[in-house]
């Protein structure tokens, strides 16, 4: 394939890293049909790797995770002259992501499906397929993140992508060491602008393809509310203050999340924030901002990525939502519960934040950082009792 003449410095550096990569240069590229994964495949081909495309069929219908994505991914493989394979993961996606998401919202938590999908539906199955079906030792994806191998700690370390606006390390904290040792992220040191330019240089059909702006399930159904309404019938309940004063009504707690201020449908003398979802009483509890902050949290099911599990308290930065800025906190390890041991995740901790936080939503991830390095992460628990989960 003839290439254009304009090459970014970041693209040239990425190409150099791929050419000097230690070990076998044979890889399966996870192709979604978007520009990021398309360029990932193109750079690997340009660097001389043996490349095969792999697309996971997640859902039926139209959209990036469905027919449209399959067609675009196949077109990219044809353009690059590489094989294209499709693996039907619809049943796994329905069970591990869709049903868990619905169950979580119904139970009053705010699940993080992208992290669960990365571990259970995407990276794990892709690595297994690549090794067993094609004898390929590595996989590559278009994620904006970096991996450092063989540091002083002897672990594969996960780092933020250099483009802070596109960094996806928050969703990748749950990947195990074995997976990180076999994954390649060629775009980790590119900006999105670099990616567009490089895709244009390669003449990729997806170079100007618009980005998905929401969770794939929300895009697929038109909105998150439409997705939830497909599975959960309306269930009217009360919106109350902490003292039980009724200030409004709702048609399902699944449409709310901790910290939410807009769209409550409540007229009050001052702005109110969601502070609790009570599935047993089918209530949404709200409070003024002065009463809505939390200075502590309990995190369970922790995956320690770049360091060994700490035995003593430590200071670090924590990110509690994908789009939120990291904040400083004091982490203290806690004894594991029986449930933690059953899930083979016997690591819990207590966090005390330097400043009150307003979006501590059970089910979301708390990801721990030291500068750009992901130390680990886990799931925010429903309560803040340091003795029980």
Curated annotation (Swiss-Prot):
It catalyses: S-sulfanyl-L-cysteinyl-[protein] + uridine(34) in tRNA + AH2 + ATP = 2-thiouridine(34) in tRNA + L-cysteinyl-[protein] + A + AMP + diphosphate + H(+). Disulfide bonds join 117-216. Keywords: ATP-binding, Cytoplasm, Disulfide bond, Nucleotide-binding, RNA-binding, Transferase, tRNA processing, tRNA-binding. Its EC number is 2.8.1.13. Residues 166-168, 321-322 are annotated as: Interaction with tRNA. The keyword tRNA-binding applies. This is tRNA-specific 2-thiouridylase MnmA. The gene is mnmA.
